[in-house]
């Protein structure tokens, strides 16, 4: 399964050419997917399908592609900035959450985080809840309207941020922000399953603003010129490592001095994290799991084997992964599981 996912991702981003038979199969799949997506958007445009209005001001932060573009840190930054003036709610669908999909769930209220780790509520909602200000509520529900209504009725919140909602047109948005990876962009520019696009590129017309994410891209000036062709206001978000801390003790790791470590993660674009990790550690081996992978004790045992093979007792992973690891590594003696925190700086253009 993992090999198949890697194959698709390589095809999506022009790192591998599909065989003739696979190309035909993917092309047929894309043809029917495109028909469905175009029909959906057409029905919304002629008001046959109607976007549900809410009593809240709704800001959507989304993307056109599958995989990680760096949306979560941007949602955190936006919510914390808005929270300087009023109470805010972040609404997430709760992808890979084990909670009931029929109800809206409060992951964090004004007082506390309701879950000890992300294994139950989902890694991204947990990460959001840990990093936002006290007056930011985090709620999950596939039914965004239900979650928005809960935020207003229970907490009196008037402004909500939808974490990933560009393709979901059931709720009317007051502002739509589209996040694009400056390096990966739209890959081969094909729709699923042939490419990474969930929506046609032409649907950028629905965005009010674009945030171009720079994760150490040397060609950011060229990317800036590329995004200008969409004729939308845009900003550039630059990601940089902010700190490294030990997951077990929470102590800061100061100047790792290129110690040997095993880097691992379960995110959409693992290579970008590994590039950051190489600035601080010598990485004899890296391990990538499927995006949103739920870690098990067996996974930890396998990681320890990798570390032993490479004669190190240090691991480095992401904050997104931290949410699912805490309950698994506390009793792993003799090994340090370190977490890299990324900071984001957003600049007007």
Where are each of the predicted segments found?
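A transmembrane-helix-recognition feature enriched in membrane-embedded lipid enzymes
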Residues: 2-57
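Residue-level signal for inorganic ion chemistry
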Residues: 32, 72, 128, 163, ...
């Amino acid at each position: 399964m993992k090999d198949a996912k890697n194959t698709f991702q390589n095809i999506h981003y022009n790192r591998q050419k599909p065989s003739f038979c696979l190309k035909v199969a993917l092309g047929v799949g894309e043809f029917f997917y495109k028909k469905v997506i175009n029909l959906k958007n057409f029905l919304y445009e002629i008001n046959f399908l109607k976007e549900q209005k809410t009593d809240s001001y709704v800001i959507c932060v989304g993307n056109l592609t599958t995989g990680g573009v760096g949306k979560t840190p941007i949602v955190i930054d936006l919510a914390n900035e808005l929270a300087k003036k009023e109470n805010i709610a972040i609404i997430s669908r709760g992808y890979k959450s084990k909670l009931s999909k029929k109800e809206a769930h409060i992951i964090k209220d004004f007082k506390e985080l309701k879950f000890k780790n992300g294994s139950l509520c989902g890694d991204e909602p947990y990460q959001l809840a840990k990093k936002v200000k006290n007056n930011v509520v985090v709620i999950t529900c596939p039914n965004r309207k239900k979650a928005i209504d809960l935020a207003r009725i229970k907490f009196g919140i008037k402004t909500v941020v939808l974490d990933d909602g560009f393709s979901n047109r059931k709720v009317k948005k007051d502002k739509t922000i589209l996040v694009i990876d400056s390096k990966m962009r739209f890959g081969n520019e094909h729709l699923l399953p042939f490419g990474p696009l969930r929506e046609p590129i032409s649907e950028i017309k629905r965005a009010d603003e674009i945030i171009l994410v720079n994760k150490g891209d040397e060609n950011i000036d060229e990317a800036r010129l590329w995004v200008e062709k969409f004729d939308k206001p845009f900003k550039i978000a630059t990601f940089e490592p902010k700190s490294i801390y030990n997951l077990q003790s929470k102590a800061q790791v100061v100047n790792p001095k290129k110690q040997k470590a095993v880097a691992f993660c379960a995110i959409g674009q693992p290579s970008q994290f590994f590039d950051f990790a190489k600035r601080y550690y010598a990485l004899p081996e890296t391990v990538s799991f499927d995006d949103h992978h739920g870690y098990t004790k067996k996974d930890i045992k396998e990681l320890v084997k990798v570390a032993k093979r490479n004669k190190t007792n240090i691991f480095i992973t992401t904050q997104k992964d931290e949410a699912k690891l805490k309950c698994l590594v506390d009793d792993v003696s003799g090994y340090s599981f370190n977490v890299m925190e990324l900071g984001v700086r957003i600049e007007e253009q």
